[in-house]
Amino acid sequence: MTDLEGVAGVFAWENREDQSLENHERRCRQRRWLAEEVNAAAAGFFEGGASGVLVNDGHGAGYTIDLDVLDPRLEVIHGHQRPFWLPHIETCDVTAIVGAHAKAGTPEGCLCHTMSAAVRGYWVNDVSLGEMGLQALIAGHYDIPFIFASGDYWACREIEQLVPGCITVAVKRGLSLHCARTHAPAKAREMIREGARRAMAAAASLAPFKLESPLRFRCEMKAPVYDNEQPPPGARVVDSHTVEIEARDVLELFERLYRYQRGWQPRQRPAAQA
């Protein structure tokens, strides 16, 4: 899994409307930085024994990684209208993230949010989860451990609390929503490569992240958007800011939350991948 907000050097939201040359150059530069951090992580995974690496371009509509500079050994899932948030994660032996940001409400988290800037927070079984936590929970459904994260210091602390022993690399430290103290991209890549290699060595000792079923999900929005008379399908309106969903497992939760359909999984497991 990849994201953009946790990449070294990134401190502002991506502006998809500004068509100025300055913004175009900034976006191209950030796409290259992300691809180079992915390459660094992949190099570490391969050095640690991975036979293949499948990359999920997870920022926005899945168009952010600069494929022109990507390691040719890698495969990428990108684009929108996906059958699931993390398609083919069940084909992997371990999972990880590059470019991680902290969850919504993290006081000093640089560009912290959970799925959308409109969300105040997600909780599953009263456990506060950001995007990494959801990734870990989906992986845990398939008994896949979450072994590595690189990104903001506060994102690293977040996943360490959920997955003790997970190897993390803080390439920057958020000072506020739009400010961070960052390593140079070249230094960040060195750190990521070494961290990913160590993560592969530690993978066998890490337990998958799981929560007891049934899952009780709560979403709180910053603005009042819910109407008790017209609840979202499969959800219960608690108040104008909050809905709750109960599901047998995390797959059913995502089906109800994001309207994914059952049956998207591949029928057979391909070669082991990280």
Give residue spans per PLM region.
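Short beta-strand segments
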Residues: 1-2, 56-57, 95-99, 149-150, ...
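Glycine-rich nucleotide/cofactor/substrate-binding loop typically near the N-terminus or early
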Residues: 9-14, 32, 36-90
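N-terminal glycine-rich phosphate/adenylate-binding segment common to multiple enzyme folds
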Residues: 77-116
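Active-site rim beta-loop-alpha module in soluble metabolic enzymes
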Residues: 138-146, 150-200
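C-terminal accessory domains and tails appended to enzymatic cores
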Residues: 53, 188-274
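Generic secondary-structure signature for well-ordered alpha-helical cores
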Residues: 6, 39, 43-51, 94-101, ...
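A short alpha/beta connector and helix-capping loop motif
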Residues: 9-38, 163, 168-171
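Active-site glycine-rich loop that binds ribose-phosphate moieties when present
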Residues: 80-81, 116-142, 150-154
